[in-house]
Curated annotation (Swiss-Prot):
<keyword id="KW-0472">Membrane</keyword>
<protein>
    <recommendedName>
        <fullName>Na(+)/H(+) antiporter NhaA 1</fullName>
    </recommendedName>
</protein>
<dbReference type="GO" id="GO:0005886">
    <property type="term" value="C:plasma membrane"/>
</dbReference>
<feature type="transmembrane region" description="Helical">
    <location>
        <begin position="141"/>
        <end position="161"/>
    </location>
</feature>
<feature type="transmembrane region" description="Helical">
    <location>
        <begin position="30"/>
        <end position="50"/>
    </location>
</feature>
<dbReference type="InterPro" id="IPR023171">
    <property type="entry name" value="Na/H_antiporter_dom_sf"/>
</dbReference>
<comment type="similarity">
    <text>Belongs to the NhaA Na(+)/H(+) (TC 2.A.33) antiporter family.</text>
</comment>
<feature type="transmembrane region" description="Helical">
    <location>
        <begin position="108"/>
        <end position="128"/>
    </location>
</feature>
<comment type="function">
    <text>Na(+)/H(+) antiporter that extrudes sodium in exchange for external protons.</text>
</comment>
<keyword id="KW-0406">Ion transport</keyword>
<keyword id="KW-0812">Transmembrane</keyword>
<keyword id="KW-0813">Transport</keyword>
<feature type="transmembrane region" description="Helical">
    <location>
        <begin position="172"/>
        <end position="192"/>
    </location>
</feature>
<keyword id="KW-1133">Transmembrane helix</keyword>
<keyword id="KW-0050">Antiport</keyword>
<keyword id="KW-1003">Cell membrane</keyword>
<feature type="transmembrane region" description="Helical">
    <location>
        <begin position="195"/>
        <end position="215"/>
    </location>
</feature>
Length: 434
């Protein structure tokens, strides 16, 4: 009996999934443009306004009795990014429960590519810092810095350069970035936790369980859910584990589908979609840009200061990981998977398209900055050099991706036009009905 034909790599998914992801991508694109603006503001502020930038971001506020007397920079990283990771948890669960990735075969490619896109940058960072004669002591602690992908920044760049990247590649990039974020937060929880305090951690599990029971029963009352979420966040923070882990866990326990008790899947979506509509605009429009404002500002010190900073092995390792490691890891893993499964690319695409998309994944901004600050601390020379390395690496990745993808824009416009044709007028483009 002949085997079923192998589905092409980067082929179109279902129309409902494509429509949902298009809405997500529009919001992420807007967030990416805001991220660009706030990053520029941070750099200008840090370099032209004396010490005011450092004074503001190191200003402490919060209840000291609860061990929450944190700097504004800490509040942005530990608090606001928890919202970002909450939305990430919602998105990831939806993809694997109700999205096109509920099929193990479909999920294998983005997961494998995300792993390859993390392993190779980490390896390059380690190689640079092991082989460089001037590598500072303890530099290897930053190995995970260049392993992340910032989807909002990548889509913001796409909006600026006007690329018409096909929906299948955009979807793959989004899914890869979401998996990347989950792997990144796992790395943070495992490798960047110095000491675990078990009492608050166990209490956090209790409040998380209460939150889980509430959302499974379709409780939507903010006066109950928000205090439970805040208590979980505060207790995880007190446990010594990075507080953003709480955001992911809270997102992952929200149901995607309705239970039979509440009408089953046919009665409508679960609370996940409701929460995502409420919280994604806050994440992309406020939380992540404000985090960038208080994390991306680094005093460059003119041409000589910039040159010295990027020659630091720590910065060089980050740049090499983002610019070279990401595309090598993603394209290499994808090519290897294609060979092992004997799958072919979609007939409209070429490997250069995968390369351009992989270069976009080299924009590691948000999670890379977070890991860099955890690895090297605030206000240290290595920490500032890592920040500059992330900025330079992301910028170079954006430029290279723009060059590669812009050369294929004519093909992308043709694919985009085909995806809009609805000859029978039923509201579903014809390419999704074949």
């Amino acid at each position: 009996m002949p085997s079923a034909p192998q589905r092409p790599l980067f082929s179109r998914g279902s129309w409902p999934e494509a429509r949902r992801l298009a809405d997500v991508l529009r919001q992420e694109t807007t967030g990416g443009l805001l991220l660009l603006v706030f990053t520029v503001i941070a750099l200008v502020w840090a370099n032209v306004a004396g010490n005011s930038y450092e004074e503001v971001r190191q200003f402490h506020l919060g209840p000291a009795a609860l061990h929450l007397d944190l700097s504004i920079e800490h509040w942005a990283a530990d608090g606001l990014l928890a919202i970002f990771f909450f939305v990430t948890g919602l998105e990831l669960k939806k993809e694997f429960v109700a999205g096109d990735l509920r099929s193990p075969r479909a999920a294998a490619l983005p997961i494998a590519a995300a792993v390859g896109g993390m392993a190779v940058p980490a390896l390059l960072f380690v190689l640079v810092n092991v082989l460089h004669p001037d590598s500072p002591e303890g530099a290897l602690v930053g190995w995970a810095t260049p392993t992340a992908t910032d989807i909002a920044f990548a889509l913001g760049i796409l909006a600026v350069v006007g690329s018409h990247l096909p929906s299948a590649l955009r979807t793959f990039l989004l899914t890869l970035a979401v998996v990347d974020d989950l792997l990144g937060i796992t790395v943070i929880a495992i490798f960047y936790t110095e000491q675990v305090h078990w009492t608050p951690l166990l209490l956090a599990l209790l409040t998380l369980a209460a939150f889980t029971v509430a959302v499974q029963r379709r409780v939507r009352s903010w006066w109950l859910l928000v205090p439970l979420a805040l208590a979980t966040w505060a207790l995880v923070h007190a446990s010594g584990i990075h507080a953003t882990v709480a955001g992911v866990l809270l997102g992952l326990v929200v149901p995607v589908l309705r239970s039979e008790e509440h009408g089953g899947p046919e009665a409508g979506p679960g609370l996940s979609e409701h929460f995502e509509h409420r919280w994604r605009p806050l994440s992309t429009g406020f939380a992540v840009p404000v985090f960038a404002l208080f994390s991306a500002g680094v005093a460059i010190g003119g041409v000589s200061g910039f040159t010295a900073a990027v020659q630091d092995p720590v910065a060089l390792g980050v740049i090499a990981g983002l610019v070279l490691g990401k595309p090598i890891g993603i394209v290499g893993t994808t090519w290897l998977l294609a060979k092992l499964t004997r799958a072919e690319l979609d007939e409209n695409l070429r490997w250069v398209d995968v390369l351009g998309m992989a270069m976009l994944a080299g924009m590691g901004f948000t999670v890379s900055l977070l890991i860099g600050s955890l690895a090297f601390g605030e206000g240290t020379a290595a920490g500032e050099h890592v920040t500059l390395g992330v900025l330079v690496g992301s910028l170079l990745s954006a430029v290279l991706a723009a060059v590669v993808l812009s050369r294929r824009n004519r093909v992308y416009r043709r694919i985009e036009a085909e995806e809009r044709v609805d000859a029978d007028g039923n509201g579903v483009p014809d390419v999704y009905e074949r």
